[in-house]
Design a protein with these regions (language model features):
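N-terminal leader/targeting segments and the immediate start of mature chains
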Residues: 6-50, 54-60, 88, 92-97, ...
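Positively charged n-region of N-terminal signal peptides that target proteins for export
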Residues: 1-3
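Short, basic/low-complexity N-terminal boundary segments at the transition from targeting/disordered tails
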Residues: 33-40, 109-117, 157-170
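Flexible, processing/modification-adjacent segments and terminal tails
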Residues: 11-20, 80-153, 226
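Gly/Pro-enriched, hydrophobic low-complexity segments
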Residues: 69, 134-224
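Mid-chain, structured segments of secreted extracytoplasmic proteins
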Residues: 58-94
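Short, exposed beta-strand/loop patches in secreted or surface proteins that constitute
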Residues: 27-29, 51-56, 73-75, 126-135, ...
Length: 227
């Protein structure tokens, strides 16, 4: 394990390179315009409820919870965090932090890396300070903005193997974690689990059980060839 980390530290990509490769992940979604992620939401100690996360690309996210008011975030490439609507609380904070990093498909390719950078900067992460290496849920991740063992500073984590956003710690200590990428339940591209931690406690957790609307690039090429 020490040898592995030593090899990783020998080459750590620049922030520009990391944002570029993360932005390029969106190609796998092809011409997908909307996605619905259905699952369950748990907030603090309340019982979990059925919920749907509706994504309209780019940068529009809406969370509908059984028995509750919907919450939404609408952003732009210049302001990825966007404007939030709905009752404040952990669920809305989770949506605000996650939306720029899961709904950037549809931003022009030349602008997408900068939109990701702006979202990280808005959270307070000093992405120009260089990168480090750490682990999250048994996966290696690059850490932008602070030392990986310093959770008091804003920082963005990006999984090394899949170039996907992994964790965002914002000013004030809100800690978003995007876990379990690569599962069919979340169409492989999205995280299956979204968690928001505050003060060392789990404040909100959305778990995806089914994804609808994803049209991958390979699927579209096959359909186009049949026409």
């Amino acid at each position: 394990m020490r040898l592995l980390f030593a090899l990783l530290l020998a080459y750590i990509p620049s922030a520009d390179s990391l944002f570029k490769h993360t932005a390029q992940r969106a190609r796998a979604l092809g011409r997908t315009r909307e996605v619905t992620l259905s699952g369950t939401l748990a907030v603090n100690d309340e019982p979990q409820r059925n919920a749907q996360l509706l994504l309209r690309f780019p940068l529009q996210c809406r969370l509908e919870v059984e028995g509750g008011q919907p919450i939404s975030v609408k952003g732009t490439a210049q302001n990825p965090e966007g404007v939030a609507e709905g009752p404040s609380g952990p669920a809305l904070r989770l949506l605000q932090m996650a939306c720029p990093f899961i709904a950037y498909r549809g931003i022009p390719a030349a602008d997408a890396p900068q939109a990701l950078r702006v979202a990280a900067l808005a959270a307070g992460a000093n992405v120009g300070a260089g990168a480090a290496v750490s682990r999250l849920a048994d996966r290696v991740a690059y850490v932008l903005g602070a030392a990986p063992r310093d959770p008091s500073s804003p920082q963005l984590w990006i999984y090394k193997d899949i170039n996907a956003p992994a964790r965002l710690i914002a000013q004030g200590g809100a800690d978003l974690r995007l876990l379990q990428y690569g599962t069919p339940a979340a169409a492989d591209w999205f995280p299956r689990v979204f968690e928001l931690w505050t003060g060392g406690r789990l404040a909100a957790r959305f778990e995806v059980l089914e994804a609808k609307g994803v049209r991958g690039g390979a699927q579209e090429e096959e359909e186009d060839s049949e026409e």
